[in-house]
Structures are given as structure tokens and as C-alpha cells.
């Protein structure tokens, strides 16, 4: 028996497809999302509608973004969901969530069982639309959720942690075993809730600068920041900000990265590209 086939659909490796089939897990996720009529609910990668059906039952209208042509067509003819659905057969990685929020007249509530092969770049794409998003609930590789929630001085703490926590309050919701999927992935999964900050706890003048600093620091995470960020900050400047130049990237808090970004934005602003 081919364990890549579920409900007559062959899971495509290039789309990173693993279909959720555990009813207890599905019910737990839907309860965590708590969808309400009148809200702008948007699902990324509905697949075989494991979450789409129970969420759709509670709603009059649901928007879905599905790259797989066969799955999008299958949803169009769904017996009870079809009339409720607005289907975008598009790549979520290039989708304009800001335009959709404007069209729907309210911030979006985004959810989905994300393909693990694109989950990290997709998170960064979504962060650029946090002013158009009310909240997000995603099933992700457990290791990615650990990185999203990690604090300084831990192995999991990295650029994703800093940028996620700059934009959002990140809350782990539920751990999910491989047996909850067809085909079962080789890794554990987890559900995470991300709520964009209503008021930024650490406002940054130019987020591109924060992105640059975190990229350079974590690309050389074994080096002290005196070395990894030496082209951007002198030892005197770091010390003046109360940041020890002997620290490594993983020792620096989100607040400190934002402080560094604001210093650089004021003293060496990036040119408009």
C-alpha cells in the first residue's frame, strides 16, 4: 500500500504534502483557532480539507490559498464547502495578504498546516504583512516552533526567533506526533499561535537594518559580535549601548538587536534600493 496516497490523492513531495488525519488533533487545532462568523479567515494550503471542513462549518465564508491545481479543483466541487469558499490557486510565498485584508475590510486570521519545505521563508513573507493580520495559527515542524519561541542563550535562538518576536507574540499551542499524518513525516510537529503586537515593544526605525544585523550576526554565530558585526559597530559603540562585544549572536536579546538597528539607522542609514 502506498502511504503517500490519502483520500485518493497522491501526496506530492515537491509541495511538501503531509495530510492531517487525526481527529483529536484536528479538533484541538480548530478549538485553538476558535473561528467566528464574520471574521476574515484565510487558510494556507488546505490540502484535503482536514482543517477546512471543521473551520468552514463554523463560517459563512472562508478564503483558501492552494498551489496544487488538483486540490484547488477538488475544493471547488466540495459538497458543502464549495459555495462558502473563495479559492486562490496561487503560491502563498508571493501572495499579497495586504491587498486581501483591504478587500475584506478587516485584518486577516491566517491558519494552516504549512508545507515544511517552505515554512521558514513563508513566515518571513507573512511578517511583512503583520499590519494586515490579526493572528496566525500554524502547524509546523516542531524544531521550527522551538526556534520561533526560543530566547537568548539557547541553541534554538536565531534570526527567526528575533524577527518573529519583533513582530509577534509567539505562543506554542500543541505538539503533534508523525502518526497524525499521511504519509507520516520524519519529524515531530507542533502548532503555534502568532499574534502581531498591537504596540511594538521594541520599535525599529528601519526593519531592513534589523534584518541585516541579525543575518550577519547569526551567519557567524560562533564568532563574538566584535568580529561578526565589526564592520557595522566599533567596540566603543557596542560598549556605549551596554552590549558586551565578547558576546555571541545567541546571547543578544531582541531588545538589544532593536537598539543596535536603531543606532545604525540613525548613523549609517541604508540607501533606498
Curated annotation (Swiss-Prot):
Location, primary (coarse class): cytoplasm
Domain of life per record: Bacteria
Gene Ontology MF: a single term: 16S rRNA (adenine(1518)-N(6)/adenine(1519)-N(6))-dimethyltransferase activity
A GO term from the CC aspect: cytosol
Compartments, as annotated in UniProt: Cytoplasm
Loss of function: phenotype: Inactivation leads to kasugamycin resistance. Cells lacking this gene show cold-sensitivity phenotype, altered ribosome profiles, and small subunit rRNA-processing defects.
Listed EC numbers: 2.1.1.182
Gene Ontology BP terms: maturation of SSU-rRNA; response to antibiotic; ribosomal small subunit assembly; rRNA base methylation; rRNA methylation; rRNA processing
Binding site for S-adenosyl-L-methionine: 18, 20, 45, 66, 91, 113
Keywords: Antibiotic resistance, Cytoplasm, Methyltransferase, RNA-binding, rRNA processing, S-adenosyl-L-methionine, Transferase
InterPro entries listed in its UniProt record: KsgA/Erm, rRNA_Ade_diMease-like_C, rRNA_Ade_Mease_Trfase_CS, rRNA_Ade_methylase_Trfase_N, rRNA_adenine_dimethylase, SAM-dependent_MTases_sf
Keyword hit for RNA-binding: yes
UniProt entry tagged with the keyword Mitochondrion: no
Documented effect of changing residue 66 to A: Loss of activity. Overexpression of the mutant has a negative effect on cell growth, probably because it sequesters the small subunits in the free form and limits their participation in the translation cycle
Enzymatic reactions: adenosine(1518)/adenosine(1519) in 16S rRNA + 4 S-adenosyl-L-methionine = N(6)-dimethyladenosine(1518)/N(6)-dimethyladenosine(1519) in 16S rRNA + 4 S-adenosyl-L-homocysteine + 4 H(+)
Other notes: When overexpressed partially suppresses the slow growth and decreased 70S ribosome phenotype of an rsgA knockout; RsgA may be involved in 30S ribosomal subunit biogenesis. Upon overexpression also restores cold-sensitive growth of a missense mutation in Era.
Known function: Specifically dimethylates two adjacent adenosines (A1518 and A1519) in the loop of a conserved hairpin near the 3'-end of 16S rRNA in the 30S particle. May play a critical role in biogenesis of 30S subunits. Also has a DNA glycosylase/AP lyase activity that removes C mispaired with oxidized T from DNA, and may play a role in protection of DNA against oxidative stress.
Recorded family membership: Belongs to the class I-like SAM-binding methyltransferase superfamily. rRNA adenine N(6)-methyltransferase family. RsmA subfamily.
NCBIfam families in the cross-refs: ksgA
Name this polypeptide is given: Ribosomal RNA small subunit methyltransferase A
